[in-house]
Structure formats: C-alpha cells, structure tokens
C-alpha cells in the first residue's frame, strides 16, 4: 500500500509534527516495493529468508518475573509476546527485506495484543540520541460505502509524559470523525500516561549499516548492492538468451518438402539421384556449443560478490566452503554469517524488550493485572548455537562442569532436553527419588 508524500504532509500537520528525515518515508516505500516484487528472482528476499531461518530456528523465548518464576504480570506479558513470536520468522524476514517492522502493543478486553506494521507506515518525528521519542504511525485502515479511511496514531514522549493521539482521515489525508468505522468507535482520541521512560512500541530494525551518521530508519539487508544485483539479473538474462539462441535445428533440402511446404510425415523418404545443394547433404544439422561455463563462472563470481557486499559467509548463493573441513574450519568459514545472525538477534531482543516494556506500562494503566508489579519481568532467551558450536562438545563441557559440582544438574538437563529450568529441576528430583540409596544398595548386597 502506498501513501503519497502529500498525504503524509497533511497528516503530520494534523498532529503538528515534522518528519526528521525528509526522504526516509519515500525510501522505505521504495524498499518495500522492491522486496515485494515477485516477477523475477528476488535476491533480497533470498538473503532475508535465509538469515531469518538461521536466526530463529530451534530458538525459544519466555518471560519470567525477576526471580525466574511465573507471575501474573510475566504471564500476561508473555501472552502478548508469544502472539508475535510464533510468526517471528516471517516478521524477521520482512524486517530484513524492507529495513524494519514496528511492533505496536495494545489492550483489548483485558488481553494483550501486538500489531506488526511495516516501517514504511511510520514517520519518526523526534529522537533522543538513538532512541525514538516521537513517531506517527498509520495504525489501521478500513473501508465503508466504497471509501477508504485511515487511522493514524501519534506517539510522543516528553519528559516522563507519554501521549498517544488517534485521528481518522480520508484517502487524501483530510480529517474525519474517529467513529467513522464501527471498530474505531471506542478508541479514545487522546491517551496521556505519566511515568514512562520509553516510547510505547517496539522497533525491529535490520542491522545493515545505512552508511549515514544518524541512522534513523533501517535499510534492507542488500542495501548498497544495487549494481551487483542488476548485473546478476543481466547475467541471468544472458544465460537464458544463450540457451535460447543455441537451440539445435535441422535444415532440409527444399526437394524434401511437398507442395504445401511440409516434410513427409513418415520415416521413409523418396530417394534422389542427386545430392543436396551444391553437392552437399540433404540434411544439415545446426548444433553449436553453448558457452555455459563462461556465463556460469561470471554468475558465480557475482554471487560471491553479493555475499561479500551483504556481509555474510559463502554458502547462501555459492557453494559453502565446508567440504572435508574440520569443526574449527567450519566455524571459521561461517564466522561472517554468524556475526550477522548475532546482530539480528540483538535487534530482536531490543525490539521485544521495548514491546514488553510497553505491555508492562499498559497492564498497569488498564489494570490488566494487579498493580504494583511494574518492571518485575525479564525475557529469557535460548538461542540455537549449532551453527557455530558442536552439540557433542557442548554436552561434554556441561557434563564436566556438573561432575565437578560447578553447575547444578538441572542446568545440564535443561540444555539437553529443552526444558525450562524449573521443569528440569523437577525432573532431576524425580530421577533421584527413583535411585536406591547407598544403604539400600549395601543391604541388598549383604
């Protein structure tokens, strides 16, 4: 969906706001359009999906209170975050493809929810250092009687006072009553919350460097690789053309055709006393060699260059360099990709912490859980490290530490089984209860 710059200008005037980066909105829309095109091979989508899979697969997220246990507040926050975690692979892939996604929490009927919108629907209006303190979001859209309406939400943090203002507009940016659509009737035009230290939404940003001093908006994972991608598409077109032009065909003497310019249908032909044209054969086969090796070498070279430009190790578009490699060599070969994955995970943690903070504030404001539990939560991450670590090696390390009494047995069980620490503790206790005591063993032996 595109919203033209002049419409955004009217909306910002409606809220008395100014865009910090005058070109960020148009760039974000262009990146979104490029990412969504499906008519030809989309290299940005390939990298985004690959890295999202590497980042999320076999990883878990949970929310606990400050003591590592479940509380009503932590369970409520987890309910909101898990709604977005279950589709996090898609969310991360799109964030890498277009530059970022905005996680907007809200409360409905006492339950937590989080809307996920593209950064192309956000205009940043104020910042404090690297932290967003003001933004206008195109939060929703709907239609009635064939007309399209938009709902914009303006977030502003000034000191410790957080204001959220909602306005509805027509498709040209003109203001209209907020209750124009039934689903918007109960949305308050303005909400003022005292006490928040951060803006009440999360921003999942692609870690790719935008090469600007003040990196306000995220950029796609393939940012800066336009020339390489253009050359790759040209090379693919050349390869298709090469195969098309080099198709084999058979030329036949004109005396083999009948009066309707057709060859005989059967496999038997009338013999001629004379040979073909200028003493040649009646049949001439055109079957030139295809220069696929040269074209494919060029294609592989461009693929390797694109991987380097993105900042990942070989193995996404090119062959991985892990054949007959040792574990140490495999780690070294994947170092760049793992570094990128690590940066993506850091940004995911930041976005989820921002969203959890917003849910925590909203729970207090709307009384969704008992008051007084503000800040008593923590997100527990268990990221998969198999790309860089050997599971056997890690198990041996945990076992050695446990046998020396340096870690609790439940730590080892939790790692090996994927249980929570509390579940592992109960499992260890149950297992020990089934083991005979030393006295029982001695009596049995006697």
Model-identified regions with their sequence ranges:
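Charged, low-complexity, helix/coiled-coil-prone segments
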Residues: 16-23, 29-38, 170-174, 234-252, ...
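Extended, charged amphipathic alpha-helical segments
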Residues: 182-332, 336, 368-375
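Short coil/turn segments at secondary-structure boundaries
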Residues: 91, 243-251, 316-321, 410-417, ...
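Extended, helix-rich architectural segments
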Residues: 1-122, 127, 132, 320, ...
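Ser/Thr- (and often Asn-) enriched beta-sheet segments in non-cytosolic proteins
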Residues: 62, 163, 177, 249-250, ...
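Short amphipathic alpha-helical segments
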Residues: 73, 80, 84-88, 95, ...
